[in-house]
Amino acid sequence: MVEPVQEYRLVLVTGPSGAGRTTAINALEDMGYEVIDNLPLSFVPRLIEGPSIGRPIALGLDVRNRDFNATALIELIDRLTQDPRVALEVLYVDCSASELIRRYNQTRRRHPLAPAETPAEGVEREIDLLAPVRVRADHLIDTSEMSPHDLKAELSRWFDRGAATRLAVSVQSFSYKRGVPRGVDMIFDCRFLKNPYWVESLRTLDGREASVADYISSDPRFGPFFEKLRDLVLFLLPAQLEEGKAHLSLGFGCTGGQHRSVAVAELLGNALAEAGWPVSKRHRELERRAAAVLPTHQGEKA
């Protein structure tokens, strides 16, 4: 039996207001997607009734859409998933509630779900409304610590098929004190390794420095750990690719997000790149510190 050819590549882009959905839609348009924003949900099935337009389609959907509600969107996702002609992906552009409130207060815009109330009430209402949709997402990008440029770069790694034909891997370091980053597929705790913080000459350096990496690598537990980690990830990547996944996100945490997690993320990223996988590296806490010394207008969020 010959399986039907998938005629449509369709990306549904949603998420809370202020998280960066419009930036995402514009970025996808720059990549060659046919973009339609705020299309009523009831019109979406009609979009794929005709012949394929020959390029992928991105649809922006949020609470401002006519006839939008979480139940209807989930029903639409189920319907499209079952359509053999459609290759569907759901992109959820997320953001922490505190950052969304900060953005609304900064721009003095009214929240669409609370036009006569505080932004905080609207943000809370919308996050609750979208919770069932969030768990159905194929891709989740948390823009809480991202600039528009960061978001566009991340989307390019995930959705620009011309940029890469293999599964893209992102590795990031973080501090457990500031919480585990959202949207990460696998997390590894590096706090069992020797901590360079207690070595005065290394304290102010970070895990990108060779002296810090050498110190951490001298821990007797590091060698076996890193070898098993590398082998595990290299084993998983082809399997993830076969399942149709376009992106895998790996998180590495330690106490301060400065030494151990940074070094391990750097070393693994380099190992994966040497094996031929597209890799991006991000160090959340180091970026926070760098952003803190930049002028305000350069610290604009997504």
Curated annotation (Swiss-Prot):
The keyword 4Fe-4S does not apply. The keyword Membrane does not apply. InterPro entries: P-loop_NTPase, RapZ-like, RapZ-like_N, RapZ_C. It comes from the Bacteria. Pfam families: PapZ_C, RapZ-like_N. GTP binds at residues 62-65. ATP binds at residues 15-22. One of its GO terms (molecular function) is GTP binding. Keywords: ATP-binding, GTP-binding, Nucleotide-binding. Displays ATPase and GTPase activities. Belongs to the RapZ-like family. This is Nucleotide-binding protein Rsph17029_0317.
